[in-house]
């Protein structure tokens, strides 16, 4: 009897142990299933159920881009002056020591693409069905600073989008090879089929975008809008926010287009010639073709697919393109003028009521030095907290709160060699908002 009782206890002990193990395995399996079930259906920004919240927590833990030092990014994005001052002081100290990632670094790390994408924390799946169903095209024109390019690509990257990269023919071979190495890791990122040497303020800057336009239209990706970027741009909206903004355009384009000043009219009064730089000649130009009134803007656009098709295929557009090739900085009046051309899809009329400033358009947020000042006295924005280059602000941490209050999709200029804190905080802000749908 004693032996039988002992056996019963042992048997009961084994049963409880097995049951405990089974329950433990079930919990582990449940947790694992929650981790593995982070697909498009469970990533609904409007959902507050446990599964979606836990899924986002797991995602953010693995994909967050926190500032690498003790910087209060949440305070900086809110405009907290103590946090801003601390970041500016920190930047003065750190930028003396910080070495940017080199071409060699990217050539080495991209030998293993999966490691590169994981280590650099690229988002490799759509975060919502709305984004999946609304792919965006990018024309990215670059010529230097490989880290700037890689961080910009990471910030705007989504697997459903399509990216054409144009590298200046004059760029160093090491830079070109590093760009090729990075884009080789992504099936939806490619080098433009035709590369040109880009000369400042010349036609070649437009030609780079046109080359990407041709390639992007041949892509099988059914993109809806095209955004163009340069190496000093950075997004200030998440991909989901961009999709929402582009849908609200309802087929319209968004770009600066205003009446030119007398000073800017001189840009197309005489012909310019290009060697290694642009030269003004004494040869006067004929009036624009088709009696088209000229407008001025900047190099950046948010253009519908139909607009892009008409840029490349419409005979009137082609005549204007030929006419502006020997003008000064044609990128700053070609797009602005086409935006007012009645034959262009998504354009607006000539009438002054339709003039669009850079602050009204959503294409690019820029602080011009000659417009900075006291906002209470009527200035459009406060002074730059970074430095100026060609009268344009290279943003500092003190500009970030203002930047995020605007409706633009991207801003210009950023440079980690000038202020990396503002970029790190913007990266942290955008990644948090992309995954959680809320600000820091």
UniProtKB/Swiss-Prot annotation:
Glycosylation sites: 108
Sorted UniProt keywords: Disulfide bond, Glycoprotein, Glycosyltransferase, Golgi apparatus, Membrane, Signal-anchor, Transferase, Transmembrane, Transmembrane helix
GO biological process: protein glycosylation
Domain of life: Eukaryota
Localization per record: Golgi apparatus membrane
EC number: 2.4.1.102, 2.4.1.148, 2.4.1.150
InterPro entries associated with the record: Glyco_trans_14
Gene Ontology cellular-component terms listed: Golgi membrane
Topological domains annotated Cytoplasmic: 1-12
Main localization (coarse): Golgi
GO molecular function annotations of the record: acetylgalactosaminyl-O-glycosyl-glycoprotein beta-1,6-N-acetylglucosaminyltransferase activity; beta-1,3-galactosyl-O-glycosyl-glycoprotein beta-1,6-N-acetylglucosaminyltransferase activity; N-acetyllactosaminide beta-1,6-N-acetylglucosaminyltransferase activity
Lumenal side: 31-440
Pathway: Protein modification; protein glycosylation
TM regions (residue ranges): 13-30
Lipid bilayer topology: Single-pass type II membrane protein
UniProt catalytic activity: a 3-O-[beta-D-galactosyl-(1->3)-N-acetyl-alpha-D-galactosaminyl]-L-seryl-[protein] + UDP-N-acetyl-alpha-D-glucosamine = 3-O-{beta-D-galactosyl-(1->3)-[N-acetyl-beta-D-glucosaminyl-(1->6)]-N-acetyl-alpha-D-galactosaminyl}-L-seryl-[protein] + UDP + H(+); a 3-O-[beta-D-galactosyl-(1->3)-N-acetyl-alpha-D-galactosaminyl]-L-threonyl-[protein] + UDP-N-acetyl-alpha-D-glucosamine = a 3-O-{beta-D-galactosyl-(1->3)-[N-acetyl-beta-D-glucosaminyl-(1->6)]-N-acetyl-alpha-D-galactosaminyl}-L-threonyl-[protein] + UDP + H(+); a beta-D-Gal-(1->4)-beta-D-GlcNAc-(1->3)-beta-D-Gal-(1->4)-beta-D-GlcNAc derivative + UDP-N-acetyl-alpha-D-glucosamine = a beta-D-Gal-(1->4)-beta-D-GlcNAc-(1->3)-[beta-D-GlcNAc-(1->6)]-beta-D-Gal-(1->4)-N-acetyl-beta-D-glucosaminyl derivative + UDP + H(+); 3-O-[N-acetyl-beta-D-glucosaminyl-(1->3)-N-acetyl-alpha-D-galactosaminyl]-L-seryl-[protein] + UDP-N-acetyl-alpha-D-glucosamine = 3-O-[N-acetyl-beta-D-glucosaminyl-(1->3)-[N-acetyl-beta-D-glucosaminyl-(1->6)]-N-acetyl-alpha-D-galactosaminyl]-L-seryl-[protein] + UDP + H(+)
Disulfide bonds: 73-230, 164-384, 185-212, 393-425
Post-translational modification, as annotated: N-glycosylated.
PANTHER family: BETA-1,3-GALACTOSYL-O-GLYCOSYL-GLYCOPROTEIN BETA-1,6-N-ACETYLGLUCOSAMINYLTRANSFERASE 3 (PTHR19297:SF81), GLYCOSYLTRANSFERASE 14 FAMILY MEMBER (PTHR19297)
Its job: Glycosyltransferase that can synthesize all known mucin beta 6 N-acetylglucosaminides. Mediates core 2 and core 4 O-glycan branching, 2 important steps in mucin-type biosynthesis. Also has I-branching enzyme activity by converting linear into branched poly-N-acetyllactosaminoglycans, leading to introduce the blood group I antigen during embryonic development.
Family membership: Belongs to the glycosyltransferase 14 family.
Protein name, entry field: Beta-1,3-galactosyl-O-glycosyl-glycoprotein beta-1,6-N-acetylglucosaminyltransferase 3
Gene source species: Bubalus bubalis (Domestic water buffalo)
């Amino acid at each position: 009897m004693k032996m039988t009782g002992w056996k019963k206890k042992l048997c009961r002990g084994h049963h409880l142990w097995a049951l405990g193990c089974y329950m433990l395995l079930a919990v582990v399996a449940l947790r694992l299933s929650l981790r593995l079930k982070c697909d498009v259906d469970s990533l609904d920004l409007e959902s507050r159920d446990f599964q979606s919240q836990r899924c986002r927590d797991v995602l953010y833990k693995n994909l967050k881009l926190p500032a690498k030092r003790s910087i209060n990014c949440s305070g900086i994005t809110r405009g907290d002056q103590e946090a801003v001052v601390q970041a500016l002081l920190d930047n003065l100290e750190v930028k003396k020591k910080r070495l940017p990632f080199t071409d060699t670094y990217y050539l080495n790390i991209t030998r293993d693409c999966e490691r590169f994408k994981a280590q650099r924390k690229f988002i490799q799946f759509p975060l919502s069905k709305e984004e999946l169903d609304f792919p965006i095209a990018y024309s990215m024109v670059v010529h230097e600073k490989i880290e700037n390019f890689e961080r910009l690509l990471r910030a705007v990257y989504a697997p459903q989008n399509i990216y054409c990269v144009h590298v200046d023919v004059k760029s160093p071979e090491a830079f070109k090879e590093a760009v090729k190495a990075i884009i080789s890791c992504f099936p939806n990122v490619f080098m433009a089929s035709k590369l040109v040497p880009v000369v400042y303020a010349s036609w070649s800057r437009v030609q780079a975008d046109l080359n990407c336009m041709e390639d992007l239209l041949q892509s099988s990706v059914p993109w809806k809008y095209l955004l163009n970027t340069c190496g000093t741009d950075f997004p200030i909206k998440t991909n989901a926010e961009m999709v929402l903004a582009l849908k609200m355009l309802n087929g319209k384009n968004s770009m600066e287009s205003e009446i030119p000043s007398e000073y800017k009219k001189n840009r197309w009064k005489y012909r310019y010639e290009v060697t290694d730089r642009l030269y003004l000649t004494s040869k006067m130009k004929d009036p624009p073709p088709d009696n088209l009134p000229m407008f001025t803007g900047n190099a950046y656009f948010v253009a519908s697919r139909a607009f892009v098709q008409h840029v490349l295929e419409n005979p009137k557009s082609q005549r204007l393109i030929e006419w502006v090739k020997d003008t000064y900085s044609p990128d700053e009046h070609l797009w602005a003028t086409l935006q007012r051309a009645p034959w262009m899809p998504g354009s607006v009329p000539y009438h002054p009521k339709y003039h669009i400033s850079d602050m009204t358009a959503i294409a690019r947020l820029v602080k011009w030095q000659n417009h900075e000042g006291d906002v209470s006295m009527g200035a459009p924005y406060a002074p730059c907290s970074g430095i100026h280059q060609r009268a344009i602000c290279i943003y500092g941490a003190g500009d970030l709160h203002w930047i995020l209050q605007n409706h633009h999709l991207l801003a210009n200029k950023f440079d980690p060699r000038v202020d990396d804190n503002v970029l790190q905080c913007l990266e942290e802000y955008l990644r948090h908002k992309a995954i959680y749908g809320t600000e820091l």
